Amino acid sequence: MLNIILGGAPGSGKGTQSDLIVEKYGLQHLSTGDALRAEIKSGSELGKEIGELIAGGNLVPDHKMIHLIERYLDNLPADCKGVIFDGFPRTVAQAEALELLLERRHMKAVLLDMFVEEDEVIKRLLNRGKTSGRADDNYETIKKRLQVYQAETKPVCTYYLHRHNYFAINGNNSMEDTFCQIDNILRLIQK
């Protein structure tokens, strides 16, 4: 089973590349961002809490995210070829918890880290904010999200690097060139 953690700063192109990977490899796509936005839209108490955290540029607490992931893994179809984790794990504690969840299921994952220059990330997110209407795509919140990413999520890369499950991807390139890098790595992993 091919399990991929698609990492990178907000706006690095994780969602776009996830779609391309799903199309080519037939994997299940778990976008935690989509799952969290759906919870917010539901109007539940949890959704309200999550909405306030996200609007402020903060991460959702680990225990809530881990519960969401465990529920997702428990409901995978029997013929599942693998999962793309888009937006998870975002902390080392989440990475450790994910590793345990996967080990219990005799699975493992690799991290594909999409690096994009900060100026390019800001430009992409501001442009996305104009068309998406997402409250978290404004300059102040973007800067805070990038600070949170550097402080809390970037260490996840080191965690996977030490486990030899880390691959760096240059996300500054075109969508096609970036996918070509990813595709080459995935073909090597599957051999």
Predicted features by range, described:
Residues 1-191:
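Glycine-rich phosphate-binding loop of ATP-dependent small-molecule kinases
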